[in-house]
Amino acid sequence: MAAFTFENFLSGAYTGLPIDKFRALGLNTEDYDEQRWEMLVKCVDSGLMQFSCSRDEALVLLWNEEELPKDDDDEVPYEVPCWTPDTDATVIDDVSEWLAEKTSVRDTVVVCSDYDAVSETPVEVLSVELEEDSEEDTIADVCLDARRKSFRDYFTIVEEEFVEEDPLISLNDGNVCPVRTHEVTSLEKPVMLDVGRRCDRVNLESLQGAINMNLPSHAYFDDTWHQYFVEGSKLDVDFDNIRLRQSEVFCDRDLDRYYQPELFAGASSRRIGTQKEALVAIRKRNADVPELADSVDVERLSESVAKKFLSSYVCDLKPVVGVMEKMRAYHQKWGDKIDPMFLLKEHNLQRYEHMIKTDVKPTVAHSMHVERAIPATITFHGKSICAGFSPSFTALFDEFQKSLDERVVIPSGPISTIEMDFDIRNKYYLEVDLSKFDKSQGLLHLEFQRKILCKIGLPAHLANWWCDFHYKSFISDPRAKVSFNCSFQRRTGDAFTFFGNTLVTMAMFSFCYDTRQFEKMLFAGDDSLAISSSPIVGCSDYFVSLFNMEAKIMDPGVPYICSKFLVSDELGRCFSAPDPIREFQRLGKKKISADNDDALFEQYVGFKDRMSHMRNFSEYEIQQLKIFFNLKYKQSGEVIEDYMGACMFYSDNFKNFKTLFTKTCAPLVAALNKRVKDKPFRLPPSL
């Protein structure tokens, strides 16, 4: 055996007994534990530990359970006690205080700086690491660099199911598991911002410039006095049969009662339902029904359309078997809210009330300076009739959605979202724009609609009854004193409007295109979008020749439905992004009451909800939005940056949002005049 010297020991050349090494370091031999000492020597010699002292000093410090000196060159921002399998989970409360330091491909060591936070000694912790290192399988790398990309990465959807008792619970609220993430940042080296935030330089002038670039004819459009011109001029309209009486509604608009928008994006003024305005709207929305279709056998064609509908969309009719029970539950729930003193009387279901919408839908066409926008009309039953039919159609719609093929999405009811686990990149898109949708529907649409309702679970007597009072109806406007007859056309405000429009759109679409070529199909009223991986084949001429519809196939096709673009993230998940032009056209409303801030605050809440996820867009998603915007509007997508910044800035707080609207001083002056009139100013008695 070689002679023992302290220099040989330090150099590792000495191979004597372990207790001799222990004694040479000046440690007490009475405390000697051979197993523990050998384990410490192996740890130091293996190179797993990082320390800035000599080998013998490290052995002495580890034996005395003292802290090793840190290496000044290695900066560790945050250090936390080691977490072993026996450690109590309640010891470590903050994820941001621990960090894994990777030293090699095989080994991952957790740097330990505070041993009082855990129950194990340093020797026990190191022994656990050696046992894990001795296993045959390599240790997986620990990745804690979880960068926050978007709001949806905080949660993971576990499941989603329909709740039979209360459909409101099923509004896409599944159980979620929070994903705990953290960011490691050195406090000594502040992070410099190379690129400013999009909301830093937002102002009304730059936003108005972006709107003027995309909508050049909308910036200087002002129709404040257009309705006065209509009321004071001669009106020539042609009707086959219409009844008029003296109306008491006048175009007396108090402009000072409403907020005035600061953005000029082509928003129309509030329309008043005078008799002339009602006649213009009826002429546009109900009269002049297009006759584009050829002569067809209505009975045979309606049966073929109904069969094609079922084979294309419905995969399981079991959910609609119990629809009657659910209808009964809805009716009982509604019946409990009826006043027991409610007067029961008969109603003629063929009679509808009529009114015009005070809001005019903004348009993106560059024709506002040439053609005046016509308001839409609403044809509806009374509250009692709608309350009687709504439970039946609501129950049927809920069960109908459950029976649809997984490729079909109707963003309404229990599934009121367009978020999907579906990648829309590198696809072919088909968007069909159906104009004059309501008044173009005739006997054929009513017949195949009735047969579809019977096949998906609605009782035959109820379906026949509902369709019977659509064959011929009598519509009257009690304010404008206008009444006329109407047949077959869609009633725009009854209990079956959205569901019926969706069924008609789906039925016509399935008859014109083979639905097996599509991977996803989205329908909402008269809007439709189909996505395919191969070039789309079909016959769009059937929309005109068979169904009497004016159909326009959007070219180039983009993923756009319900005034929203569809984009995909890096993981292939699809979600909706609001159309920026449509959003800022809504901010030009001229019918927000200025009596108090409640009405304006409601507009702010709605805008904030729609823009909630816009600030979390990644650059990858913004580039998609720019491309789709360019394809749809034939405009440069660079203005998306201005829109994104404005969305974030004006949705931050109500104070920023309020700068988009101004209030005139006329209401304050009127209130002051009223106060002076009621209580005139008088000199004080002392004078």
UniProtKB/Swiss-Prot annotation:
Catalysed reactions, semicolon-separated: RNA(n) + a ribonucleoside 5'-triphosphate = RNA(n+1) + diphosphate
Highest taxon, organism lineage: Viruses
Enzyme Commission designation: 2.7.7.48
MF-aspect GO terms: nucleotide binding; RNA binding; RNA-directed RNA polymerase activity
Pfam families, per database record: RdRP_2
Keywords in alphabetical order: Nucleotide-binding, Nucleotidyltransferase, RNA-directed RNA polymerase, Transferase, Viral RNA replication
Ranges where the RdRp catalytic domain occurs: 427-540
InterPro entries: DNA/RNA_pol_sf, RNA-dep_RNA_pol_alsuvir, RNA-dir_pol_PSvirus
GO biological process: DNA-templated transcription; viral RNA genome replication
Complex and partners: Interacts with replication protein 1a.
Family: Belongs to the ssRNA positive-strand viruses RNA-directed RNA polymerase family.
Function: RNA-dependent RNA polymerase which replicates the viral genome composed of 3 RNA segments, RNA1, RNA2 and RNA3.
Name of the protein described by the UniProt record: RNA-directed RNA polymerase 2a
